[in-house]
Amino acid sequence: MSYNYVVTAQKPTAVNGCVTGHFTSAEDLNLLIAKNTRLEIYVVTAEGLRPVKEVGMYGKIAVMELFRPKGESKDLLFILTAKYNACILEYKQSGESIDIITRAHGNVQDRIGRPSETGIIGIIDPECRMIGLRLYDGLFKVIPLDRDNKELKAFNIRLEELHVIDVKFLYGCQAPTICFVYQDPQGRHVKTYEVSLREKEFNKGPWKQENVEAEASMVIAVPEPFGGAIIIGQESITYHNGDKYLAIAPPIIKQSTIVCHNRVDPNGSRYLLGDMEGRLFMLLLEKEEQMDGTVTLKDLRVELLGETSIAECLTYLDNGVVFVGSRLGDSQLVKLNVDSNEQGSYVVAMETFTNLGPIVDMCVVDLERQGQGQLVTCSGAFKEGSLRIIRNGIGIHEHASIDLPGIKGLWPLRSDPNRETDDTLVLSFVGQTRVLMLNGEEVEETELMGFVDDQQTFFCGNVAHQQLIQITSASVRLVSQEPKALVSEWKEPQAKNISVASCNSSQVVVAVGRALYYLQIHPQELRQISHTEMEHEVACLDITPLGDSNGLSPLCAIGLWTDISARILKLPSFELLHKEMLGGEIIPRSILMTTFESSHYLLCALGDGALFYFGLNIETGLLSDRKKVTLGTQPTVLRTFRSLSTTNVFACSDRPTVIYSSNHKLVFSNVNLKEVNYMCPLNSDGYPDSLALANNSTLTIGTIDEIQKLHIRTVPLYESPRKICYQEVSQCFGVLSSRIEVQDTSGGTTALRPSASTQALSSSVSSSKLFSSSTAPHETSFGEEVEVHNLLIIDQHTFEVLHAHQFLQNEYALSLVSCKLGKDPNTYFIVGTAMVYPEEAEPKQGRIVVFQYSDGKLQTVAEKEVKGAVYSMVEFNGKLLASINSTVRLYEWTTEKELRTECNHYNNIMALYLKTKGDFILVGDLMRSVLLLAYKPMEGNFEEIARDFNPNWMSAVEILDDDNFLGAENAFNLFVCQKDSAATTDEERQHLQEVGLFHLGEFVNVFCHGSLVMQNLGETSTPTQGSVLFGTVNGMIGLVTSLSESWYNLLLDMQNRLNKVIKSVGKIEHSFWRSFHTERKTEPATGFIDGDLIESFLDISRPKMQEVVANLQYDDGSGMKREATADDLIKVVEELTRIH
């Protein structure tokens, strides 16, 4: 068996649908957004969208409509999922708790029936008498809306018109009436039918219209007074209502296809239309009042408003604000203005919502050499195409920044005796000290009486007896707060300079070379208590009081030069309690005693970014449990701060890190800043609960996230990225992308808009000796769109496009790899292409092109003609492995820098995906699932080891380990196949057994090994092995990791118990949702744990947790089973949340 845990690292971000109405209350205007399986509910306010609730559905949302039956005070929500679960939901709020109640539910799937090519359509009669569904060809399904029907019952009505394009209910009809566009061999037509609930039949409709435009694709039902319907085509817009027929063909809409629409006014006089290029139009219906007072339609008019993201759905909110939901790019809130701007646009973007979808390819790189992967994705398409850089970390939100180079330390002060909050920030520089006064959000430079400003400060702070202290290189100065004046000063007897110092509210320890002095702070007096000599110079020291020692520290921690040791000394005697040799030659730069979750620790950071941490016994001063992590490459400065009433440590370096404790384990979390040299906590009136941070040039004040999460940076390309790889030697990414150009009158083509490939710093164009350009069998015609493919070289630091290489006409770039070949020391970018002509069923020729990028130039080193499309390439033991149409081929790299075929494997339909491990090759086929090959180096050929004989249409594959292979297929499922080496017969050995099945509900485009969290930092007890990330069409990022059998069984038990306790929205069974489901079979999920469900344990109430753990057997690592407590499981689940 294979045991795996699958969990969401980033929820889907592509918007599939949106509706607006009064769902949370009759007064609230709501926006509801569907993102595949997730439903987000917002209230529209004057300030923008306010999130109310997010609901995870056990299903892909296919239909989402608000409606208000008679007798209801607010709207209800109808949802239909892709697995045909229908439900009617209501919003209920009591106090703080919000519930989404399932008023009615049922499954409306038919045993037989051919699912319609145009997808699922769901509509609701304007009078709320029924819901209509078009799920299968030739059938119209009706759900009557009775008052108190808990179960949704449906019946079918036969439709003679098999191929329905779109259907709507009409307004103002006595009986519910549908209007639809359908296609038959003669063309497309519009027809209406009345639906009789009693006879469960169609009656003849009020009107029909034969032979409408051949591309007519959308029906818009128009409310009264007009009534009737608008039909949207590729070139024309027509209005029908039986008596009246009006058609317009505005040239402006011909350029692209209109894909979505939304009514602006309740009376239907204005509609928004969005097309595939992201253009937004207004359709206006002009009225004419007749003598008898009736209103008829006088004219239709279309106006171009401007450009938005490419819309999947539009919804008009209020006051000229429109929500543009996008699947191919970021969604937007836009404002429609009365007057146009200089570019002639009436549209202004107000807010943008990040969307990673569709993730076409991605790679994990550790750009900052930090042991933490960043994910770089090829996201979006057409003008919305971009790269997204995704990393996990703690965010700092900048509130103010001041240009101040050279800061060497900073401290907050409360300058007045009775202040609760900080009002001053003291900054130290080489040879000087500056004081900033904080007044609200204003910052101004000031002077503090009693402080010196011509020396570098080592420490500054509020101390006991309403006093301030300033420790400089020359002396320790005690200053009274009221009035501000120097009351006591301590200098080293020979007036030597102080080199390091530490201070708490009533104690000071300073080091002068090898000497240590201990002072106590009394009212208006610094009293020297003791001093001692160490055998080496003191590099760092700390006297933070721990435990309940009344603010006094009985211990002093120091780090020494020369012998590179950390020591714990007793105060006041300076008696040595513990000496820890750190080893190596790098001196300790910062030392800190701190308490996390009531455990005491000593942290010691060295000058090379390494950090040692120990358990500290505050009674004896002994250190235990020595551990080491690497946090950066430069000297690290440790400072504590409090956030959410817990202690955290901020490690300042070239790779700032926050250290905190969870389940008595230290967690090291990246901060999304490039570099921090010094920091201090700041809690002022204008900047409450903030941090002040200094780097080489700037002082920043900001607040910190409570938890670590994914941070996403966008690099717009304005064209479609297809493939990405990283090349360390040149510090670049290679990206394959395509832009759309349009054929002009001269026979050439022009780009639609500037994009990455047209704006690169330098460019080149393929000229191939292999294909003469005249042999192209396909001539393009004027106005036709053509794809132009490029290899982009992108700088890893600035993400600037350094070079764009354009491929041949009709040449599609399909695969990309960066690797070394044979004994050749150079690293190459290698691209696989296909010559694509519309009249060919599959490509008959293509190229493999080897490029080298160095010193800012891209050179073509070699090219190889192949008889087909190069779908996939990987480096394989110093050779190049490629899949070309149905062939898997291995090339070796000769000393003449040419690719020479070594061996082939032919037994595939279309080999789309390749992954390798050692001498094993996993091949993913278009329709024949996966196949395992082994390369025999001695014979120089491939041997077919085993294959999965189930017909899975693959979308991505990955090797989990030597025996387990992960696949994703086109019905949104994951499966794991296992090689059965122990089988007795050859035939059994040749079968890959499907040992894991799971319905993900997402279309996976790419798998890759890697992790988004810091690797090997701190300790973990979760027994997960390996980490495979995946990216999907909806912009979801997920993770698959392997479990041991005992952990799998525990989590499976927990999963089953959670299903009994957590009520699903829409009353859909979890087991039904996660069951592996294709057109040919449905099987229960097995071998996979649903991590999203497991993690929801942390969100349920304590009593529900108790319900889950009742009688659950749990092995806490001692080998003995006992009954689990809620806290045991909280620990387990918190550990699991940390893997993503």
Curated annotation (Swiss-Prot):
Gene3D superfamilies (alphabetical): 1.10.150.910, YVTN repeat-like/Quinoprotein amine dehydrogenase
Region entry WD repeat beta-propeller C, spans: 709-1043
Residue positions where Phosphothreonine is found in the record: T1125
Modification(s) after translation: Phosphorylated by ABL1. Ubiquitinated by CUL4A. Subsequently degraded by ubiquitin-dependent proteolysis.
Location of this chain's protein in the cell: Cytoplasm; Nucleus
Reported impact of W953A: Impairs interaction with AMBRA1, ERCC8, DCAF5 and DCAF11
Alphabetical UniProt keywords: Acetylation, Biological rhythms, Cytoplasm, Disease variant, DNA damage, DNA repair, DNA-binding, Host-virus interaction, Intellectual disability, Isopeptide bond, Nucleus, Phosphoprotein, Repeat, Ubl conjugation, Ubl conjugation pathway
Predominant place of localization: cytoplasm
Biological pathway: Protein modification; protein ubiquitination
Gene Ontology, cellular component aspect: chromosome, telomeric region; Cul4-RING E3 ubiquitin ligase complex; Cul4A-RING E3 ubiquitin ligase complex; Cul4B-RING E3 ubiquitin ligase complex; cytoplasm; extracellular exosome; extracellular space; nucleolus
PANTHER family for the chain: DNA REPAIR/RNA PROCESSING CPSF FAMILY (PTHR10644)
Function in brief: Protein, which is both involved in DNA repair and protein ubiquitination, as part of the UV-DDB complex and DCX (DDB1-CUL4-X-box) complexes, respectively. Core component of the UV-DDB complex (UV-damaged DNA-binding protein complex), a complex that recognizes UV-induced DNA damage and recruit proteins of the nucleotide excision repair pathway (the NER pathway) to initiate DNA repair. The UV-DDB complex preferentially binds to cyclobutane pyrimidine dimers (CPD), 6-4 photoproducts (6-4 PP), apurinic sites and short mismatches.
Domain notes: The core of the protein consists of three WD40 beta-propeller domains.
Disorder noted: White-Kernohan syndrome: An autosomal dominant disorder characterized by global developmental delay, variably impaired intellectual development, hypotonia, and characteristic facial features. Some patients may have genitourinary and skeletal abnormalities.
Name of the protein described by the UniProt record: DNA damage-binding protein 1
